[in-house]
Amino acid sequence: MNFRRCWLRLTARNSNFNGRPAAFKALWSHADDVTLSGGFGGTIERGWEQVGRRLDWVGAQFSKGTNTIERIAANTSGDLGYLVQIEHLRFQVAGQTKESTRTYRVTMLFRREPEGWRIIHRQADSNVTKQAPQ
């Protein structure tokens, strides 16, 4: 699979915001060197066991969600690739009826594996507005 087709499949991630993380988890490498620095903060997860558990937890937080993506940059060199994007989320917290929104800056790294391109790192944060130090 070419790299562009891989990142187009990231739209499968919308199911993650509806309590079904399996499609997004399938885009990840299941190797011991994957890392996740998620938008909810906390520790940086290392290795597929920790990352997979965190993705399950994240999926359980959402219902009725959508994710609109603004792609900023994407490229590859050899067996590595990267993707930089802004993600605009609309969702309900699981068990609640009020709609919420969040916007994240996201950087993902990919590696070409025998099964195709897989995510090996994702970093997301909500610092989308420039702020001077205080």
Regions found by a protein language model. Name each.
Residues 1-27, 79, 131-134:
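Short, low-complexity N-terminal intrinsically disordered segments enriched in polar/charged residues
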Residues 21-78, 86, 100:
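A solvent-exposed, acidic/Ser-Thr-rich amphipathic alpha-helical stretch
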Residues 73-75, 90, 109-111:
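Generic structural detector for well-ordered beta-strands
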Residues 82, 103-130:
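Short beta-strand edge/turn micro-motifs at domain boundaries
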Residues 85-92:
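Generic short beta-strand segments
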Residues 88, 127-134:
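A short, hydrophobic/aromatic-rich structural module that often spans a beta strand
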